[in-house]
Amino acid sequence: MARQITLFDFTLKKEQNKDESRKEEIPHANINEERRKPKEWIKEAEEGKSYFLLQVDYDGKKSKAICKLYDKETKKIYILYDNTGHKPYFLTDIDPEKVNKIPKVVRDPSFDHLETVIKIDPYSGNKIKLTKIVVKDPLAVRRMRNSVPKAYEAHIKYFNNYIYDLGLIPGLPYVVKKGKLEQLRPELKGEEVDEIRKAFADSDEMTKEAVNDWIPIFESEVPDVKRVAIDIEVYTPIKGRIPDPEKAEFPIISISLAGNDGTKRVLVLLREDVNSQITKHDVIVETFKSERELIRRFFDIILDYPIILTFNGDDFDIPYIYYRALKLNFTPEEIPFDIINDEGKYLAGIHIDLYKFFFNRAIRNYAFEGKYNEYNLDAVATALLGMSKVKLDTLISFLDLDKLIEYNSRDAEITLKLTTFNNNLVWKLIILLARISKMGLEELTRTEVSTWIKNLYYWEHRRRNWLIPLKEEILTRSSQIKTAAIIKGKRYKGAVVIDPPAGVFFNVVVLDFASLYPSIIRNWNISYETVDVENCKNKEYVRDETGEVLHYICKDKPGITAVITGLLRDFRVKVYKKKAKSQNISEEQRSVYDVVQRAMKVFINATYGVFGAENFPLYAPAVAESVTAIGRYVITTTVNYCRSIGLQVLYGDTDSMFLWNPSKEKLEEIIKFVKGKFGLDLEVDKVYKFVAFSGLKKNYLGVYPDGKTDIKGMLAKKRNTPEFIKKEFNEVKQLVTTINSPDDIPKIRDQLEYKIKEIYEKLRHKGYNLDELAFRVMLSKPLESYTKNTPQHVKAALQLRSYGVMVLPRDIIMFVKVKSKDGVKPVQLAKLSEIDVDKYIDAVRSTFEQILKAFGLIGANLLQLLSILSLT
């Protein structure tokens, strides 16, 4: 404890004494004090110069939209204020005369004026007249929208509204002409354009027109923007406690920076209570006797960078720096950061919190194919980079400076490399996603894929001058759901699943419908304004797997969802997947095209899930139900055809079928059948040496010819499974991969039985340590929010808090199961002697019985194996 007091006294108290005279001259820093104007941090863009648009914000002091532009020559951010006179607004369907009689609108201090505008009804294609209520302040829209019967386009952030109206696309290059942004189109060779147009030769006219607008999105240069990753280390007096950023009561002891310009730098505080000897490092080390001077130096360095990268910087690094600087008597005008809506804003450029980007499920599942299961820096970096954080055996507070520098610099290095590895894959992906979604970098990297898709479709509505319909109007105009859900919590029947047998099957081929739901949306012209609409001449009926008619789709005109989804799918499949594999271009260009197709994959695969979600603003129940019904019809029809030609379908789930020992000729026949009947692409996705089915849906272990495994649904794959189970399961998995024929099964069965006994004995004799026994579960919300029930990890977190440990949302809680009232204890408070062995035996049984059931059908005495785990 003496060490803790010494350090605290040495930093904060000395800083306070040193700055007493400064306090007399400079008023105490107030968070609400007027901040330095943005243009003092960033220079304005010049007429005639070209830039990349990265972000659009709103400057409340000037009451104008502000574009943040990157100059790849100077490597700096510049700003361009709106000079079109654009103002915030929303629409209503009542006449201006009636609006003028609503005092809460026209007497509001922010009311500006009314206009009459013409929009197109997405359903009928007819022109409709609306009143545009123009205001001076975006917040006024929120106040006024409830004062009119129907307020259209009144829940859109102002900077997004600005992007829609001006047709801007963040991530693309522009030139400043007469104070406005004019898009620069890439120069393509004639054969490249011909190749793209050929891919869309059979498309409708709306799609063909859209193709020309989308080419720059995929073909324009992706700038390698100058950026720096930062990471701070803060003194912590108690093990496990995360310092509160808003209180910022403990000193910052080091800040590391790693830039894509080669910068590697650590700013470190010299302290009397730790070994301050510094040996040679591969980073530049700057030492400071004063924490205030360390922070001031940090501010000076980062102003040279237009982009700052952090990992969880919104929640910790940026707010801690900001509030700590205020506490050390920096004025707000001296601090190039601000905290707005719980986001850490970098006033001299753009701040990207990579934690939130990698936390996005669409990025994890579609862009990186589930390579990481946890979202902390160490887990993501290990999975994607093969690098990990420096391991520590003591508190950061007590590290000697040498170890602190190594630890701190590694974190910044890893954070930067997450955007630079594999030819800047992640950075390019962010830019491409910004272009597709029409979102600025800061909002894109902090929001879910549903927001990206919503933004894309709103932008497309505005480009066509379509009125963006109200959610309640879509629900009213959409017909009712006709099917009952099988899964609890769903409103309509979902995908068809063919129950798998329990057993081991050799030579299994998996056929996959390429992007099934997006392809159905495109091929059947499904969109909220095409399903069950009135006054339709050309109808196509939607039938489910039983032949029952559920809905009809209007083919009079292309639906917007069908056009955009089909366009992205065809760009990916027909153009960029091929380019990413082409040997006629450079490796660098291939990597760019690979990023392009990955970005489209994210949108394509997420489309149905988003449009089928009830909270999505363009959700129509009949649309979601039509897609799944057609999917069931396609799968059922295909399975029946397979069986009619002698193919045995072992298992089927949503968009795939597992076929047992099919011939090449039969595979070609079924692929041809699907293409001819449905216009869908059926592909060979996987070929297994064998598959072990447990008999449960979405639950199997497949082994490829090269010995690699593919595990689905088994508990040992779950990220909260204790390490000892994962380790033992991996050993079992290695045993199973040695199987080459049914003749190998008896030997493996004996080895499995021995392994089960070994695990049991090790548990009974406390052969595993606490870390190996720990369950790891992320805390998804503040502890106070758990009011209805208290999950086990929350019980453990509450115990930690009772010992003074700060526990925050997104913390990973490590706990073990013990014999006590709560039944659990956090690892930090538990003893090995307290472990409830029976609970762990249950966990082992539930994990291993899934794989043992597969072998039970070919001779293994399953009941005997499982009964071993019931012995007491």
Curated annotation (Swiss-Prot):
Database matches in Gene3D superfamilies: 1.10.287.1390, DNA Polymerase, chain B, domain 1, Helix hairpin bin, Palm domain of DNA polymerase, Ribonuclease H-like superfamily/Ribonuclease H
Biological process according to GO: DNA-templated DNA replication
Please name the PROSITE patterns in this protein's record: DNA_POLYMERASE_B (PS00116)
Q: Which UniProt keywords apply?
A: DNA replication, DNA-binding, DNA-directed DNA polymerase, Nucleotidyltransferase, Transferase
Give any Pfam family that matches.
DNA_pol_B
Which top EC class is given? transferase
* Organism domain of life: Archaea
SMART domains according to UniProt: POLBc (SM00486)
What is a single molecular function from GO for this protein?
Answer: DNA-directed DNA polymerase activity
Q: Which reaction does it catalyse?
A: DNA(n) + a 2'-deoxyribonucleoside 5'-triphosphate = DNA(n+1) + diphosphate
InterPro entries attached to this UniProt entry: DNA-dir_DNA_pol_B, DNA-dir_DNA_pol_B_CS, DNA-dir_DNA_pol_B_exonuc, DNA-dir_DNA_pol_B_multi_dom, DNA/RNA_pol_sf, DNA_pol_palm_dom_sf, DNA_pol_type-B, RNaseH-like_sf
EC number(s)? 2.7.7.7
- Supply the PANTHER family for this chain: DNA POLYMERASE 1 (PTHR10322:SF20), DNA POLYMERASE CATALYTIC SUBUNIT (PTHR10322)
Q: Which family does it belong to?
A: Belongs to the DNA polymerase type-B family.
Q: What is the protein's name according to its record?
A: DNA polymerase 1
Name the species this protein comes from: Sulfurisphaera ohwakuensis
Q: Which gene encodes it?
A: pol-alpha
